[in-house]
UniProtKB/Swiss-Prot annotation:
Species the sequence originates in: Rhizobium rhizogenes (strain K84 / ATCC BAA-868)
Function, in words: Catalyzes the transfer of a dimethylallyl group onto the adenine at position 37 in tRNAs that read codons beginning with uridine, leading to the formation of N6-(dimethylallyl)adenosine (i(6)A).
Stated name of the protein: tRNA dimethylallyltransferase
Reactions catalysed: adenosine(37) in tRNA + dimethylallyl diphosphate = N(6)-dimethylallyladenosine(37) in tRNA + diphosphate
Class of this enzyme: transferase
One GO MF term: ATP binding
Residues that hold ATP according to the record: G16, P17, T18, A19, S20, G21, K22, S23
Site (Interaction with substrate tRNA): T107, R129
Pfam family, one: IPPT
Amino acid sequence: MIRNPMSDIDAILITGPTASGKSALAVELARAHDGVVVNADSMQVYDTLSVLTARPSETDMEGIPHHLYGHVPAGQAYSTGVWLREAAALVAQLREEGRTPVFVGGTGLYFKALTGGLSDMPDIPTEIRSRLRERLLAEGTDELYRELVLCDPTAAESLSSQDGQRIVRALEVIEATGQSIAAFQGKTGPVIIDADRARKIVVLPDRAVLHQRINGRFEKMLAMGAEAEVKALLALGLSPEMPVMKAIGVSQIAAMLRGEMTRAEVLDTGAAATRQYAKRQMTWFRNQMDESWERVSP
């Protein structure tokens, strides 16, 4: 139980590393504040990977409404901007109903966008987006990066030559608008959540406890059907550059399906990758979340 609940709040924000117990805390606080849980994790939006992304089950939800989970097809382009628009519409609806949105997830950028706004990026025609993503798959990042250097050197200088998703995004913007993506990144859209009227919690467990949870969790995921999920995902034939293909466990389980890894190796490498990801999250939260965020160690 979290101590010292605040009064007169209109939103609750909960973040923390993977396997920290934040989803259960969200349900607890949603129940206490007549709230609704809203996903703020960039991988839990996809419909294909329920087990592998640790999306809350019906049992986990305990009868509390949960939104923005599993509603995006794996092959569909999805961005922080799209999530923010969906979150804004949901917050407006919940405020009309007098209910408290309880945002929970490990994607730090989502929380920064909620409370600080996001660059007002232009809409990209589907034809342009599809064509460039097909080119990324067919030609690779090096070729598209060389093209970006020629047409938008400012954007190219700020990106890794191997960051396929961001290279494509920059090319999309300049083709659709004739302007560099940098011109839009300086324009900030509306703030959805007033940080001063939100209860903000970052869950930071003891490292040893977190590692123990992660080790057991990955094994449980395999037992619950993660292998079948990855098999279904691979059957879609998506580009390896699509965000959903980069979910932790996908590459390891795919290797097992190809006969290149044993189950034991999948457990070891999957858990190791999850621990590394949790470490990066912990570092980011400690550096980015100021003193207004309540630190909790479960």
